[in-house]
């Protein structure tokens, strides 16, 4: 796990009734890119238990450079995903980068 050093938090505000459709699109997207994006280590989708219009998408990265390259304006696959799901958004996602200081999953 020590090769996961950075995380991008994507806070998504969805229109009413769009969560299931958006989650399906996100899962399909990640299934297609896994193993094909340098430095990409995985993702997690979190659905807010109290607010059905909020979803968090966390992406995990080997390096900040890998993460920044992926989230650049020149990434057409990400741009295409955003264009496809944009009608489901209440507003554009908020993106925040984090340095992972400690990451442990108990076995």
Language model features with spans:
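Short, surface-exposed ligand-recognition loops at beta-strand->loop->(often short) alpha-helix junctions
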Residues: 13-26
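Non-catalytic surface loops within mature trypsin-like serine protease
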Residues: 14-16, 63, 99-102
């Amino acid at each position: 796990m020590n090769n996961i050093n950075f995380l991008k938090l994507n806070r998504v505000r969805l229109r009413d009734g769009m969560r299931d459709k958006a989650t399906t699109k996100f899962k399909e997207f990640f299934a297609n890119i896994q193993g094909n994006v340098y430095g990409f280590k995985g993702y997690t989708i979190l659905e807010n238990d109290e607010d059905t219009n909020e979803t968090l998408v966390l992406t995990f990265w080997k390096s900040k450079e890998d993460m920044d390259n992926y989230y650049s304006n020149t990434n057409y696959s990400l741009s295409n995903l955003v264009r496809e799901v944009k009608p489901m958004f209440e507003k554009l996602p908020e993106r925040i980068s984090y340095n992972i200081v400690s990451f442990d999953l108990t076995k």
